[in-house]
């Protein structure tokens, strides 16, 4: 089981695009690795179509997509062909064939009571090879690709500007598209913030809840 902040383990995998080395082949880029329970299943098909439709948006964020299941590479190839023939959507990203479950077990994608199939896991790995986000969905519930994109944008924004992002950013109920300034770490800076709030020099609910436009 891997944890947030850990390095993504080095591994060599077989995919529909040939052999890949993770995370080395994606050095300098972010990548989203997502597992699905099985090929030729309805929920997984809807997810793959949406990931493919949004693939260019991920690329614009310097991010590559990688699928994974415990199926054989031949099954992946035929399923990808089926998707294109029956939905008109081309799957542009590689899909890992983890038929022995080695990668899935190493990453904690196979959960108790679910047999040898993976749950719907999502790993977001940054351009330094560090695991930044992990999501798990049950086999019976499909993922929201827009939420994965939102989380990716939020992580990159936090890194670039040194801020935190609120619920549903950039459409938060309380502060709309504003970002959250890190809280004061000592009494002096907290008091300074209180004075700025009184003078209406900064936007805040309190000294520990300061927000601002991103730019």
Curated annotation (Swiss-Prot):
Entry's Gene Ontology cellular component terms: cytosol
Domain of life: Bacteria
Role of this protein: Thiol-specific peroxidase that catalyzes the reduction of hydrogen peroxide and organic hydroperoxides to water and alcohols, respectively. Plays a role in cell protection against oxidative stress by detoxifying peroxides.
Active site: 44
Organism of this sequence: Caldanaerobacter subterraneus subsp. tengcongensis (strain DSM 15242 / JCM 11007 / NBRC 100824 / MB4)
CDD domains: PRX_1cys (cd03016)
Domain Thioredoxin, chain residue ranges per copy: 2-157
Name under which the protein is recorded: Peroxiredoxin 1
């Amino acid at each position: 089981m891997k944890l947030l902040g850990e390095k993504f383990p080095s591994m060599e995998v077989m995919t529909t695009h040939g052999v890949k080395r993770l995370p080395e082949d994606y050095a300098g880029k972010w990548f989203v690795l997502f597992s699905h329970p099985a090929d030729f299943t309805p929920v997984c098909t809807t997810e793959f179509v949406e990931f493919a439709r949004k693939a260019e948006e991920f690329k614009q964020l310097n991010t590559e997509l990688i699928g994974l299941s415990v199926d054989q590479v031949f099954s992946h190839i035929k399923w990808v062909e089926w998707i294109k023939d029956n939905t008109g959507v081309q799957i542009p990203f590689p899909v890992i064939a983890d038929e022995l479950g080695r990668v899935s077990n190493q990453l904690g994608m196979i959960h108790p009571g679910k047999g040898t199939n993976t749950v719907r896991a999502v790993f977001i790995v940054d351009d330094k090879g560090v695991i930044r986000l992990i999501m798990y969905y049950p086999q019976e519930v499909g993922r929201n690709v827009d939420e994965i994109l939102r989380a990716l944008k939020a992580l990159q924004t936090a890194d670039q500007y040194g801020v935190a992002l609120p619920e549903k950013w950039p459409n938060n109920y309380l502060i709309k598209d504003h970002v959250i300034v890190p809280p004061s770490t000592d009494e002096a800076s907290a008091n300074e913030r209180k004075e700025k709030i009184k003078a209406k020099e900064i936007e805040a609910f309190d000294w520990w809840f300061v927000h601002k436009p991103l730019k």
